[in-house]
Amino acid sequence: DAIVLAEASITRMNLDVKYFRLDPHIMVPEPTQGIIAVIARKDRKEVVEALKAINDERTYAEATLERQVVVDIGGGCHSPLGVLFRVNDNGIYGIAGISDGRRKVVVEDWFEVDDSDAGHKLAKKLKEAMKSEGLILKA
């Protein structure tokens, strides 16, 4: 028997269990999985400033790139689309996968650390791979 849980849940519940992380090549996570978004009214300047102080720029960049893929592919909450970006000092790593229930297409690539279009480029690569594999999703 097995169950899939977020690692944060295991940590938060202080569970002493044996577990392993899923390889994103096997199961690409949902876009922006695990990212907490907070919004505030523009006229609440003290709240906006407090949020800016705790904002994680790397995570924000990763979420932005993942959203680029979702928009370019035409995905949404019910799309069988996984996207993951990791930004570090050496560059940007992106992986995206999509499935029709029988077949799966996964693409990945490295980008320059300042490439703000990495999400668009990965989406284009995924579309090309989908076309090559004959993978067409119903709208």
Can you describe what each PLM-predicted range is?
Residues 1-139:
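Small-molecule-sensing regulatory modules
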